[in-house]
């Protein structure tokens, strides 16, 4: 009788254990499937919204406008600065009143730096062409500095002062396809030029 009771109890315990394991496995599989279904549904929904134009990628949008940027420059003869000793650098002056995102600012600074380099280094027919200053800048590590500018009025003053001192300069105007009005002056590029001369122009500005 005791053997039958022990055997019966063992069978019940074994059945209970098996049931518990089955329940746990079933719950785990159900949770996993539900999670996968939710992820798949979210992915499909996002894909559909992107196709319908409801979602967009700000980075791609900013990059797509890059070819439409324009610069304002005067062909400035800067060879008179070649004999000034010391560090040669480029300054990128960023307007603060436009509310540009960091990505937007980075793109505009790239435009300004490339524009300044093209003016001073790529076309011997231009008055702004200055291979000596370019080489000094390249040999010293292409130093660049980013500075804050409060508004368009201040930027115009800085640009005029750069021209009067014979410093290579370019103002970048936005295409107006994403964040700000078309034609807005966003970044002023200065140089490459001796730091001593740039400080006369931007000495009162704060670092960005």
From Swiss-Prot:
Keywords: Cytoplasm, Hydrolase, Isopeptide bond, Ubl conjugation. It catalyses: an N-acyl-L-alpha-aminoacyl-tRNA + H2O = an N-acyl-L-amino acid + a tRNA + H(+). GO terms for molecular function: peptidyl-tRNA hydrolase activity. One of its GO terms (cellular component) is mitochondrial outer membrane. It comes from the Eukaryota. GO terms for biological process: negative regulation of proteasomal ubiquitin-dependent protein catabolic process. It is found in: Cytoplasm. Residues 32-45 have a biased composition (Low complexity). There is a cross-link at residue 152 (Glycyl lysine isopeptide (Lys-Gly) (interchain with G-Cter in ubiquitin)). It is an enzyme of class 3 (hydrolase). Its EC number is 3.1.1.29. Residues 59-77 have a biased composition (Acidic residues). It holds the Pfam family PTH2. Residues 46-58 have a biased composition (Basic and acidic residues). Belongs to the PTH2 family. PANTHER family: PEPTIDYL-TRNA HYDROLASE 2, PEPTIDYL-TRNA HYDROLASE 2, MITOCHONDRIAL. Present with 2190 molecules/cell in log phase SD medium. The natural substrate for this enzyme may be peptidyl-tRNAs which drop off the ribosome during protein synthesis. This is Peptidyl-tRNA hydrolase 2.
């Amino acid at each position: 009788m005791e053997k039958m009771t022990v055997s019966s109890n063992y069978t019940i315990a074994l059945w209970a254990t098996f049931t518990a394991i089955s329940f746990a496995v079933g719950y785990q599989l159900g949770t996993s499937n539900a999670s996968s279904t939710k992820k798949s549904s979210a992915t499909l929904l996002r894909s559909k919204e992107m196709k319908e134009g409801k979602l967009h990628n700000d980075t791609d949008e900013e990059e797509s406008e890059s070819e439409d940027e324009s610069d304002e420059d005067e062909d400035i003869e800067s060879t008179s600065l070649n004999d000034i000793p010391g560090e040669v650098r480029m300054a990128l002056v960023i307007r603060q009143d436009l509310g540009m995102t960091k990505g937007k600012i980075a793109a505009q600074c790239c435009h300004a730096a490339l524009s300044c380099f093209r003016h001073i280094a790529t076309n011997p027919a231009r008055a702004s062409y200055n291979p000596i200053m370019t080489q000094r800048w390249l040999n010293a590590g292409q130093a660049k500095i980013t500075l804050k500018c409060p508004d368009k009025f201040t930027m115009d003053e800085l640009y005029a002062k750069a021209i009067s001192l014979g410093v290579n300069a370019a103002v970048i105007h936005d295409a107006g396809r994403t964040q700000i009005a078309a034609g807005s002056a966003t970044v002023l590029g200065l140089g490459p030029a001796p730091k001593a001369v740039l400080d006369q122009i931007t000495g009162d500005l704060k670092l960005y």
